[in-house]
A protein has these predicted regions:
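Generic anion/oxyanion-binding catalytic loop in active/binding sites
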Residues: 11, 52, 151
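Acidic-and-aromatic substrate-binding clefts and catalytic sites of carbohydrate-active enzymes
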Residues: 55-62, 85-89
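Helical hinge/lid and interdomain linker segments adjacent to catalytic or ligand-binding clefts
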Residues: 44-49, 57-60, 64-65, 69
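HKD-type phospholipase D/PLD-like phosphodiesterase module
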Residues: 19-45, 69-179
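Hydrophobic h-region of N-terminal signal peptides that target proteins for export
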Residues: 11-21
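Short catalytic-loop micro-motif centered on adjacent basic/acidic residues
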Residues: 50-55, 79-81
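Sec-dependent signal peptide recognition
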Residues: 2-10
Length: 179
């Protein structure tokens, strides 16, 4: 019985300790707007291999420049944009980023609403870096979101969250239409 208890305690510590190394941060805007934008740019800027993005509205030039620089360094970037918010938006980064080497862009609408001629939207604000970090929250990637809005941004390297985000991204990517 004593050996069983020792094994039980050791297993409990090991299972509990698996998540201890995870780095997570949450930012509330507008109070932490600069820290939030820096966290997003730094996370994207740390990419060595891949960046996967699903974004409703993306007009922020600072963030676009970070992606441009990573693509120039060979990072493969896939961006899913919401169709309605970006297709005819002259401020969207889709045309600029879609023209760059190592960046592929596509458009996604939400699901069709029953028998009606209406589609939902792709309302994600998600980035996955190297399959190791995930960033998500309420903020569109716009200047306004990071300067004036009440938004939230969450950054994590927790493996279970990253894997779940990658799976969701993969499902959206399969339905995405070329720009």
């Amino acid at each position: 019985m004593r050996d069983f208890m020792r094994i039980f305690v050791v297993m409990g510590v090991l299972v509990w300790g698996v998540g201890l190394g995870a780095k997570e941060a949450v930012y509330f805007m507008p109070q932490e707007q600069k820290a939030a934008l820096n966290a997003l740019k730094n996370t994207l800027g740390s990419a060595k291999k891949t960046i996967h993005i699903a974004i409703y509205n993306f007009t922020n030039k600072e963030i676009a420049k970070v992606l441009r620089d990573r693509a120039r360094n060979g990072v493969q970037i896939h961006i899913i944009y919401d169709r309605e918010s970006n297709l005819k938006n002259p401020h969207s980064t889709i045309g600029y980023l879609g023209a760059l080497r190592n960046i592929s862009v596509c458009l996604l609408s939400g699901k069709k609403a029953g028998q009606k001629n209406y589609f939902g939207i792709m309302h994600q604000k998600l980035a996955i870096v190297d399959g190791e970090q995930v960033v998500f929250g309420s903020a569109n990637w716009s200047k306004n979101a990071f300067e004036n809005n009440y938004e939230i941004l969450f950054v994590s390297d927790k493996k279970a969250l990253v894997e779940k985000a990658e799976n969701a991204f993969g499902e959206m990517l399969r339905d995405c239409k070329a720009y």
